[in-house]
């Protein structure tokens, strides 16, 4: 066999292997970017040697074989995939090809949409009633998932409105919002079930359940983006108008569909969506650009596996492959031991990544990770990079097991893991330098006592020099002692002392949050402060009484009760009060008695806020008598929508729930 033939054979074999893992096993081994790279390489070689193209080459078809666990459905109109572009130059080349083929571009308009990262499906309606649903499969034959699709609430079982075709096959994407993905994995970790690497895998695994009752428990949703079969009816002559028609018939359509009349407008749309991507609430991996006119689409036609009139403009990969060089263990403020993978540095989503969290011992076991392994790293938005998969087929012979410590790597105290918890913890408490540092950093942080100018490096030095052991020791510092720290002159030292004095005047809620009670965030601290009013009342509260606070369950109540039952914690609180930490006398008012537009209401925040942090907004709302929930339901009274609000806003509008923007929230807060 000639070298070029050998190379082509190996590439095709590798691609088929990855297609099988992706489409059939729902367990991809490499990120999409690596698959795309291999496919581009194969196409390039085949274009140079067209005589060596085989009918079964991955470039000549859409995907892999369908699952055999479901009955098979042959698509009347093939479900083709799209060609990809990865940079502006490639998109402009696509635009030029379109213009050259059309000759006249006077009426050329692009319809731009989100490229959803889920599972492509076709749904057939006969006389407006859902009768069949199928996966894409290999583009020609898919799997019958009708029973499962019927459980997805976003998908109407019957269309409504006028002029519905006798047979209409719509196409779209089933996907899992980020909140639903986190909920599924949280439950899986609690029960010992399967933990999914990403929302796409979770959506695929949920949709391909043989038992529809399991699918029904998964919060899947759907956006419609196209049509296959059309009989006994008519549709508008443009893609964008068709989407509006689908929406009128009750099919969910993304609200981020935009018409662009120039290539420059398309690039602006791409950049805007990329900026909003972390706040959407669901995963996308690019934008889809389609010629809007159906007549022009027909004129442009198709190539072997994709239309000439559309392209997927993909974002920089959020997943990349690299090697694990070592695993180290960090100690948090509550003693949690967190394994961290030290990586061969790699660029992911535009950022150089050299570390990734491994969460806990269970996660290492689930991944089957060893030191030396080739792994897939994922970084989405501001999320800490994490290892999502191990490329087992490329494990080196000298790979070493990860050994979880039995003693704290900082203070050598015993490490214990409470039954039922995933996290192992150092038992050293404040004798552990790492816990002491992290507790003090939390205490002075902006959302706690907000000590201006006291950064992490100052805290590190204060602990290492043994100037500070408890939070109360901070208020005993003098400018003279602080000048003994690195890069701390007399003026800077006095500024820190002044900031500490200013920080003594705080609020009860901030003080509670600063104490660092396990599971007590800002909103919970605000709820506890509002409910009990005084420190004395909170210290004396039973677990049962604590659970009467909105959103405080048995876990938070137990941690709070145990914190105040610990004599050393009460001593630290007494010392803080003795040093002059104080807050205004409480005015305890029941929620129904609070004169506030938020009192007694269940409120949901969505999107990004520009004037307050999410936690600050929650705390303010709770203080005014609101209950802040994490998801929209029929019990929700009000949704506050910031920039790039996603699926929560859409659901609120669907349910007819009142929606206000950030400016209106600030006005109602009295700002």
From Swiss-Prot:
Listed GO biological process terms: DNA repair; DNA replication
Keywords: DNA damage, DNA repair, DNA replication, Ligase, Magnesium, Manganese, Metal-binding, NAD, Zinc
Residues the record lists as binding Zn(2+): 408, 411, 426, 432
Alphabetized Pfam families for the sequence: BRCT, DNA_ligase_aden, DNA_ligase_OB, DNA_ligase_ZBD, HHH_2, HHH_5, Nlig-Ia
GO function term, MF aspect, one: metal ion binding
Positions of the catalytic residues: 115 (n6-amp-lysine intermediate)
One GO CC annotation: cytosol
Highest taxon of source: Bacteria
Names of the cofactor(s): Mg(2+); Mn(2+)
Domain BRCT: 593-671
EC number: 6.5.1.2
InterPro entries: BRCT_dom, BRCT_dom_sf, DisA/LigA_HHH, DNA_ligase, DNA_ligase_AS, DNA_ligase_CS, DNAligase_adenylation, DNAligase_N
Membrane-spanning segments: none
PROSITE patterns the UniProt entry points to: BRCT (PS50172), DNA_LIGASE_N1 (PS01055), DNA_LIGASE_N2 (PS01056)
Enzyme class: ligase
Signal peptide: none
Amino-acid positions noted as binding NAD(+) in the UniProt annotation, renumbered to this chain: 32-36, 81-82, 113, 136, 173, 290, 314
The reaction(s) this protein catalyses: NAD(+) + (deoxyribonucleotide)n-3'-hydroxyl + 5'-phospho-(deoxyribonucleotide)m = (deoxyribonucleotide)n+m + AMP + beta-nicotinamide D-nucleotide
Family the entry assigns: Belongs to the NAD-dependent DNA ligase family. LigA subfamily.
Role of this protein: DNA ligase that catalyzes the formation of phosphodiester linkages between 5'-phosphoryl and 3'-hydroxyl groups in double-stranded DNA using NAD as a coenzyme and as the energy source for the reaction. It is essential for DNA replication and repair of damaged DNA.
Protein name: DNA ligase
């Amino acid at each position: 066999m000639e070298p070029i033939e050998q190379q082509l054979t190996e590439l095709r074999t590798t691609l088929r292997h990855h297609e099988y893992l992706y489409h059939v096993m729902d367990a991809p081994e490499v990120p999409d970017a690596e698959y795309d790279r291999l496919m581009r390489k194969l196409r390039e070689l085949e274009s140079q040697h067209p005589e060596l193209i085989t009918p079964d080459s991955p470039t000549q078809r859409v995907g892999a074989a369908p699952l055999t666990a479901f009955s098979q459905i042959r698509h009347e109109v093939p479900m083709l995939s799209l060609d990809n572009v990865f940079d502006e130059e490639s998109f402009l080349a696509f635009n030029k090809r379109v213009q050259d083929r059309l000759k006249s571009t006077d009426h050329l308009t692009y319809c731009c949409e989100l490229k959803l990262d889920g599972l492509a499906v076709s749904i057939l309606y006969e006389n407006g009633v859902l009768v069949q649903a199928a996966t894409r499969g290999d583009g020609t034959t898919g799997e019958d998932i009708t029973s499962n699709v019927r459980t997805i609430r976003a998908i109407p079982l019957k269309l409504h409105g006028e002029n519905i075709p006798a047979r209409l096959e719509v196409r779209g994407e089933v996907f899992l919002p980020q909140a639903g993905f986190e909920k599924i994995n949280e439950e899986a970790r609690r029960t010992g079930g399967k933990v999914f690497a990403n929302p796409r895998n979770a959506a695929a695994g949920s949709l391909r359940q043989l038992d529809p009752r399991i699918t029904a428990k998964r919060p899947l949703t759907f956006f419609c983006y196209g049509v296959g079969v059309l009989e006994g009816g008519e549709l508008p002559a443009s893609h964008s108008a068709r989407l509006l028609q689908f929406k009128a018939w009750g099919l969910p359509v993304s609200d981020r569909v935009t018409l662009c009349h120039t290539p420059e407008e398309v690039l602006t749309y791409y950049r805007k969506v990329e900026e909003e991507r972390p706040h959407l609430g669901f995963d996308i991996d690019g934008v889809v650009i389609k010629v809007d006119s159906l007549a022009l689409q027909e004129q442009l036609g198709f190539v072997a596996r994709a239309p000439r009139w559309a392209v997927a403009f993909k974002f920089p990969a959020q997943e990349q492959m690299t090697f694990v060089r070592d695993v180290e263990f960090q100690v948090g403020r509550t003693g949690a031991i967190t394994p961290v993978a030290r990586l061969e540095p790699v660029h992911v989503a535009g950022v150089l990544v050299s570390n990734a969290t491994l969460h806990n011992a269970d996660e290492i076991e689930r991944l089957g990770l060893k030191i030396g392994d080739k792994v897939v790293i994922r970084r989405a938005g501001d999320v800490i990079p994490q290892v999502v998969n191990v490329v087992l087929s490329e494990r080196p012979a000298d790979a070493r097991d990860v050994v979880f410590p039995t003693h704290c790597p900082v203070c050598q105290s015993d490490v214990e893991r409470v039954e039922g918890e995933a996290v192992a913890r150092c038992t050293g408490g404040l004798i552990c330098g790492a816990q002491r540092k992290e507790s003090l950093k939390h205490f002075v942080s902006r959302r706690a006592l907000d000590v201006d100018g006291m950064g992490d490096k100052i805290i590190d030095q204060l602990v290492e020099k043994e100037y500070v052991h408890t939070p109360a020791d901070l208020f005993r510092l003098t400018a003279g002692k602080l000048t003994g720290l690195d890069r701390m002159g007399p003026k800077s030292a006095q500024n820190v002392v002044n900031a500490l004095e200013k920080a003594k005047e705080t609020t009860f809620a901030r003080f509670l949050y600063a104490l660092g009670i396990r599971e007590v965030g800002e909103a919970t601290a605000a709820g506890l402060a509002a409910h009990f009013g005084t420190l004395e009342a909170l210290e004396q509260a039973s677990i049962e009484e604590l659970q009467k606070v909105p959103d405080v369950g048995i876990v938070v109540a137990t941690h709070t009760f145990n914190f105040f039952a610990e004599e050393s914690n009460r001593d630290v609180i007494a010392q803080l009060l003795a040093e002059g930490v104080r807050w205004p006398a409480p005015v305890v008012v029941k929620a129904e008695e609070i004169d506030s537009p938020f009192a007694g209401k269940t409120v949901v925040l969505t999107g990004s806020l520009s004037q307050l942090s999410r936690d600050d907004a929650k705390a303010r709302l709770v203080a005014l008598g609101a209950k802040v929930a994490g998801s929209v339901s029929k019990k929700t009274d009000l949704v506050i929508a910031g920039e790039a609000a996603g699926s929560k806003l859409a659901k609120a509008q669907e349910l007819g729930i009142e929606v206000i923007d950030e400016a209106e929230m600030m006005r109602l807060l009295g700002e």
